[in-house]
């Protein structure tokens, strides 16, 4: 999911505990989302693992159901995926503690947002990348584990393909080529977004640049989820093939956005890539060296 805070930019997440050993998390892969099984202030919480987000977010319904008594509340502006633009939302300041597999994270602030209309009723919040981007992160969809390592060893990458990437504001941009048809090829950086349950979603500036509106065989879509999702619309089209680096993807469908605002109207990347693609692979994320490693699972 593509989310960013537009105020309080200097604040961050404090990692309370650290380890030199691999830390393994059991995850659930449901509805094309990765769920980390955590505790929030001592109460169970399923947080969506999201490489497209930076912070930890909590769902407003989850917070109400748990009867948390947070006292330090502020406000911030947050952009979402849809076309409504930034929205004012409440933030909890310094009172949230998240525990996962024995490790504790205490965000300096936590946005309180209406996530379930966008992600589903299983989602109690989002776990973004700021808290763990200093680690090597390995994700195994089939065996449903996510592991954090202090360093990358040659044994860990056996059988994987290394792909150099760009890291901007803890977001991962991967090199991508989309062959729409014999006349249209789209190449550039695409956002790695494990918070998305979709496949390849082409941004509206890229769609306009390549005249995708002229494709006649397409299916419209639109949603208005409320919360961070806002309103979003576009079309699903057939494509010939697509690659990440030199790795061919198993898909012959893509969507393109017609949004005028929001992250799908961004010119910073050509497309957003969600879990319908990433679940085809075992994955290792190496932020420090701007690399990811992929292996067909």
Predicted features and spans:
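Bacterial Sec-dependent N-terminal signal peptides
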Residues: 1-25
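Pepsin/retropepsin-fold aspartyl endopeptidases
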Residues: 21-297
